[in-house]
């Protein structure tokens, strides 16, 4: 099938920012001006096109990254609207992985906010070129130049202003185009559809000349031929400036900065112009390199062409109430069409594509064919998960998957009624398949189901979705820490189990010695000699001991790191049995532990906190208050990375606490490191709570 839009006229972009910077409103205006939406949806009315889940419309925030397609000036633009809340980092992560460029939206009052820094770092990691849009210029306290300075200082970027605001706050009425030397004013009556071009206001002429000079210098520095021309005093043409800034933007040496107010319909069309002028097409970015699954050392370059064999990445799964499973798919080479069979190299299974959809938020359009560089939704895949590679069977290739962050918070969840139990299990498994940063696991010791995610809001939304989509009522509690028990000194037990109650009795007798076995788990040594216990009964003693160790004598937690030596015993020719020796073994280990000074152990987490220097003292003090032991510190571009070991029991609620202490500017990750003795006072409380 032939293309309607050539690849060089395609843009795959994300709209990213801190929560409340106005990303979704900006996207709404883009859809309005490109003719997709005939009525503007407002986020604060809960009528936004892109925020299509009920929870999003209620909370006025974007949770899942909705994908939509629009056209501007002969270009096709695929837009992914991403959430700005730190709990939904995975949505941003998986969007950036498949995008070619991004629009970073900033609040003109707040400037560079914490999540802006996080998202910017993610975009750096994936090498995504950006343009910046300083939004909300009509707000009280809006300051365009302060925002530009923050982009330079906090994000370590090299911003180049392509526009200047005309007025600010209530008096914000338009923008100056520094490249073409004109003012642009947006007609209120037509909701900004009509744009009036005019001369530069006299009071801004001096500032315009100064900033235009800065812009031309920044552009010329990126190109030797232009620099020579500029230094000779020759005026650079608009085409030369645009070409130069485009090249530097794609190579991530410059970041063009524009301004406006999406809510007031000011500056959105020039932003669209900037998207097609400065952000890359799929042909302008480095070609995707994968590996041969049958020979991992062999690299395979997936050239962006419809004529190449198919290779692409499933970057998101979603459930549609009318269609079922949707798999969002970025095509890096080749093409897909409905009815086609593809190879999933991650699962090593073949899959048939049912339908192909172009998405517009939660509306959809059936298409028959999609080519290299496109983003589409596939229907009918049964095996695919987020991060899977789909390709042509004749050229198997595996692409780099997504970087899935480890969950940082977990809570216990249980169905309110027995009838909810099966539905809870189904719902949790479905949600975990859609969202790889959400995990479900059973705790065998407590019998609880634990759900883990990126933060409290993340898990709140999950519980909310269980109720709305799966009709499951669930109670959510505080999880229990998985403590362990062990011994600190050797002990001995001589235990006889004898039972006579008419007929055949029960008889088992064993003598065991136990000692601490740090770091080596459970070890069983059989030192019986001379047949005092027949060898067929030895495994029963071992099994009885191991089963008894599943529930320790202090608080019923599993016992670890213990060495057991079976040294002596006796048996009865008639009454002895495997069952009798099983019971004798379990009784002996309990008795021996009482004599071996048992203690509680708790999980210690390896925690890394990255915080701006301003909050270092506060963060350190808080970690010390949580019984944390700081292991190391290192400077990281305007921030400090603290490595500490902290008991898991002290880490509940830490995500929220850290966010409030640092205005959300610090991030942390943690993973299990080892078990350590619980201080006596705390152990006493834990034991008391279990009795």
Curated annotation (Swiss-Prot):
Residues that coordinate or bind GTP: 17-24, 81-85, 135-138
Subcellular localization: Cytoplasm
Top-level division of the source organism's lineage: Bacteria
Annotated Gene3D superfamilies: 3.30.230.10, 3.30.70.240, Elongation Factor G (Translational Gtpase), domain 3 (3.30.70.870), P-loop containing nucleotide triphosphate hydrolases (3.40.50.300), Translation factors (2.40.30.10)
SUPFAM superfamilies: EF-G C-terminal domain-like (SSF54980), P-loop containing nucleoside triphosphate hydrolases (SSF52540), Ribosomal protein S5 domain 2-like (SSF54211), Translation proteins (SSF50447)
CDD domains membership: EF-G, EFG_III, EFG_mtEFG1_IV, EFG_mtEFG_C, EFG_mtEFG_II
MF term (GO), any: translation elongation factor activity
Keywords, alphabetical: Cytoplasm, Elongation factor, GTP-binding, Nucleotide-binding, Protein biosynthesis
Cellular component GO terms, alphabetical: cytoplasm
GO biological process per UniProt: ribosome disassembly
UniProt xrefs under InterPro entries: EF-G-like_DII, EFG_II, EFG_III, EFG_III/V, EFG_IV, EFG_V, EFG_V-like, G_TR_CS
Residues in tr-type G domain copies: 8-283
Membrane-spanning intervals of the chain: none
Function: Catalyzes the GTP-dependent ribosomal translocation step during translation elongation. During this step, the ribosome changes from the pre-translocational (PRE) to the post-translocational (POST) state as the newly formed A-site-bound peptidyl-tRNA and P-site-bound deacylated tRNA move to the P and E sites, respectively. Catalyzes the coordinated movement of the two tRNA molecules, the mRNA and conformational changes in the ribosome.
Similarity comment: family membership: Belongs to the TRAFAC class translation factor GTPase superfamily. Classic translation factor GTPase family. EF-G/EF-2 subfamily.
Alphabetized NCBIfam families for the sequence: EF-G, PRK12740.1-3, PRK12740.1-5, small_GTP
Designated name of the protein: Elongation factor G
Gene from which this protein is expressed: fusA
